Amino acid sequence: SGKGKGDLCTAACKNEPCQCGSKCQCGEGCACASCKTCNCTSDGCKCGKECTGAASCKCNSSCSCK
């Protein structure tokens, strides 16, 4: 298998790195769901993009905000 993208993510993120698909997510409480990442904004949460808001935002198996 060799080097994974998670290694690159670890190098890029200082605290708690987390690899989701091809995107790197940084920050405390970083969590990746099976539907990849969630995009947290002031008006909601969208799956399929890296998280840009609160770290507490998570996506369930149906790719919807919970």
Curated annotation (Swiss-Prot):
Binding locations of Cd(2+) 5: C40, C45, C47, C51
Binding residues for Cd(2+) 4: C38, C51, C57, C65
Descriptive protein name: Metallothionein
UniProt binding sites for Cd(2+) 3: C20, C24, C26, C35
A molecular function GO annotation: metal ion binding
Record family assignment: Belongs to the metallothionein superfamily. Type 2 family.
Induction trigger: By cadmium.
Lineage, opening ranks: Eukaryota, Metazoa, Spiralia, Lophotrochozoa, Mollusca
Known function: The metallothioneins are involved in the cellular sequestration of toxic metal ions and regulation of essential trace elements.
Record PTM N-acetylserine, positions in chain: S1
The record's note on its domains: 14 cysteine residues are arranged in C-X-C groups. These are thought to be the metal-binding sites in other metallothioneins.
Keywords: Acetylation, Cadmium, Metal-binding, Metal-thiolate cluster
Protein's UniProt keywords contain Cell inner membrane: no
Positions annotated to bind Cd(2+) 6: C47, C59, C63, C65
Binding positions for Cd(2+) 2 per the UniProt entry: C13, C18, C32, C35
Binding site for Cd(2+) 1: C9, C13, C26, C30
